[in-house]
Amino acid sequence: MNNLNIVEALSQISREKNVDRELVVQTLNDALVSAAKKRFPDVDNFEVELDADTGHMAVLARKTVVEEVNEPELEIDLEDARLIDDQAQMGAVVLERLNLADFGRNAIQTAKQILVQRVREAEREQIYDQFSIRLGSIESGTVQQISHGDIVLNLGRAEAAIPLKEQIRRERYRQGDSVRGYIFEVLKTTRGPQVLLSRTHPELLRKLFSIEVPEISEGIVTIHAVAREPGERAKIAVSSNDERVDPVGACVGVKGSRVQAVVRELSGERIDIVPWIDEPEVFIARALSPASVSRVILDRRRKHAAVIVDEDQLSLAIGRSGQNSRLAVQLTGWGLDVITDQEHQTRRALMEESQEELRRLRGVTELIALSLATSGFISI
């Protein structure tokens, strides 16, 4: 291989593997030293001259100039030394160039294996770093296969997977389909970096809205909370720092275009967009939309709320199989007890009766009786 070929080979490896050229040069240097050691296993006196710009490459052996050579791998006589350096003297050290062709097939193969392995390791590390800094972002990939329920994706330079538990249940994919997911973890494996994506993570919904709604990416509209039952229904709470911009309208878009783009991406997941407010009573009532709420009674100590609704709003507030109230709990961070006014009055009467009974007990103060009754104790 001539010098120009060496320069091009180093550049090509660097380009194709996206690995720093200096690292490739150092790896080749180490590989050549290893090849020399394999050819001459009893000595360790090798240096490599490698110029990535000119392609000059040589493996050199450090040898001491002696009168009589007993160890040819370590010593050289003065006559031969003068062919290398005409100023060489007895006892001096000269660098003798070795012929790579003399290394033998095994030594050259060792050098090649080291080069390939080190470059592969560097490439894997670079890919791992590349995707690690993209944790929390959305990535698109092409379905390669379905393996043990996991969807395996090709991201170009890396392999990704959507584990079964991170998939929307009713979604089905075929080889060649394009899929988007939220990067929630990057692993180092024996096969190289593996990127783990999720289709069910609440942050996927947040990121999709950030893509579709410029006001979010511009910092005008903020998503304060996200609640999802993936593939079925979701709620997001939004606010605007510009009174001229309606946060709900911005997320919905003209004729629903923005929210529908997100709905399509999530296979028809219905999305409620709720105006956020830093007043728990109001926020909780909004979170239970489309139901109308009559009153919200807060227990701030337990971060729990009793939500009073009319009889005809009860099933709507709770939702099918409790879905609406579950999402409201996720969205607000408050425990919610959705009841009718009649049920609330019944519970209140029972609590007052219990409180009265507890007050009659010796040693039970008014405050203790109230606390016990509120906690559900009828008698002791």
What are the residue ranges of the model-derived segments?
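RNA-contacting regions in translation and RNA-metabolism proteins
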Residues: 1-380
